[in-house]
């Protein structure tokens, strides 16, 4: 399976995907999607569009000069088939890919190394030039604290109300028991009275 590169953005064009344009001089141009095809027809420069690989390499955002990248170049030299050569080539391809990924990671880490310090210095300068930002921050912190206090108060009020409800329930249970006892006493008295009247 042959995977071609998009002529415009350099992303992979898989079989059955994308568009191929053949010019009058029989040169083939493959595009991964209509976006790239339209940009090519408008004669746009891929180095000036931030989403293309050409821009990223030109701007120094990706590894552009490395020995691992030379292996991907096409060589129009016919080679006689040799089973051992194919096996060693496949092993080498896997190893080269590993090395390339490691180097890309190292390149990215090296590129991002001083970003935290730069961000800190930029923020510091911004605060020094605009001291009112600190006051805004203080106001935000005060609001946060007020909100937290309100929440704590509401939670405590809920707990108190629950306790009061429990106490009320206990009191109501006691009252019901007392009423039942009174009713029992009244019933006993009535029975006694009825017995006396019968005699």
From Swiss-Prot:
<dbReference type="InterPro" id="IPR000988">
    <property type="entry name" value="Ribosomal_eL24-rel_N"/>
</dbReference>
<dbReference type="GO" id="GO:0030687">
    <property type="term" value="C:preribosome, large subunit precursor"/>
</dbReference>
<feature type="compositionally biased region" description="Acidic residues">
    <location>
        <begin position="156"/>
        <end position="179"/>
    </location>
</feature>
<dbReference type="InterPro" id="IPR056366">
    <property type="entry name" value="Ribosomal_eL24"/>
</dbReference>
<dbReference type="InterPro" id="IPR038630">
    <property type="entry name" value="L24e/L24_sf"/>
</dbReference>
<comment type="subunit">
    <text>Associated with nucleolar and cytoplasmic pre-60S particles. At the end of biogenesis it dissociates from cytoplasmic pre-60S particles and is likely to be exchanged for its ribosomal homolog, RPL24. Interacts (via C-terminus) with AFG2 (hexameric form); the interaction is direct, recruits AFG2 to pre-60S ribosomal particles and promotes AFG2 ATPase activity and RLP24 release from pre-60S ribosomal particles. Interacts with NOG1; the interaction is direct.</text>
</comment>
<comment type="function">
    <text>Involved in the biogenesis of the 60S ribosomal subunit. Ensures the docking of NOG1 to pre-60S ribosomal particles. Activates and recruits ATPase AFG2 to cytoplasmic pre-60S ribosomal particles.</text>
</comment>
<dbReference type="GO" id="GO:0005737">
    <property type="term" value="C:cytoplasm"/>
</dbReference>
<keyword id="KW-0690">Ribosome biogenesis</keyword>
<feature type="region of interest" description="Disordered">
    <location>
        <begin position="147"/>
        <end position="182"/>
    </location>
</feature>
<dbReference type="GO" id="GO:0003735">
    <property type="term" value="F:structural constituent of ribosome"/>
</dbReference>
<comment type="similarity">
    <text>Belongs to the eukaryotic ribosomal protein eL24 family.</text>
</comment>
<dbReference type="GO" id="GO:0051117">
    <property type="term" value="F:ATPase binding"/>
</dbReference>
<keyword id="KW-0539">Nucleus</keyword>
<protein>
    <recommendedName>
        <fullName>Ribosome biogenesis protein RLP24</fullName>
    </recommendedName>
</protein>
<dbReference type="GO" id="GO:0005730">
    <property type="term" value="C:nucleolus"/>
</dbReference>
<dbReference type="GO" id="GO:1902626">
    <property type="term" value="P:assembly of large subunit precursor of preribosome"/>
</dbReference>
<keyword id="KW-0963">Cytoplasm</keyword>
<dbReference type="GO" id="GO:0042273">
    <property type="term" value="P:ribosomal large subunit biogenesis"/>
</dbReference>
<dbReference type="GO" id="GO:0032781">
    <property type="term" value="P:positive regulation of ATP-dependent activity"/>
</dbReference>
<dbReference type="InterPro" id="IPR011017">
    <property type="entry name" value="TRASH_dom"/>
</dbReference>
<dbReference type="GO" id="GO:0001671">
    <property type="term" value="F:ATPase activator activity"/>
</dbReference>
<dbReference type="Pfam" id="PF01246">
    <property type="entry name" value="Ribosomal_L24e"/>
</dbReference>
<feature type="modified residue" description="Phosphoserine">
    <location>
        <position position="172"/>
    </location>
</feature>
<keyword id="KW-0597">Phosphoprotein</keyword>
